[in-house]
Amino acid sequence: KQGGTWENDITEIGYKYQMTDITAAIGLASLEELNEIFQKRRCLYQIYQSCLEEFGDLLLEKSDSGSDFTPWLVTLNTKGKRLALMNHLREKNIESAPVHYRNDQYTIFQDYAQRSFPNMDKIEDHYLVLPLHTKLKPEHVERICDEVKKALR
């Protein structure tokens, strides 16, 4: 994914069975730590919010007051500067990615995807996902935000 290359193309119809019994057991054991994981993600997301608030609507996820919001992703509205921002972050050894790809772009669907999707085309070049995981520390998020600011100014 990094660097704008597409490493996850779908070229034929098939099945995606990837979870093993071991993976399931690890997932079940992780449930014991779920509240701690959620709290850490909320804390890191709040750092992103406060560090990037000068850019207004840069962060796409919003939490309503009174909701128990736990972010899965930190998605930015790059305002058309996605590739430049990705390149800048990569130079600074910071991972970023579009994450979700449109189904009509996969090779397997090329015979069926001959339609125009102007709204999706407009959105596609404007979003980018930043790191958010439990191994991140607050100082990492602050560094990421500093680099985002440098790239978008």
Regions found by a protein language model. Name each.
Residues 1-153:
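PLP-dependent aminotransferase class I/II
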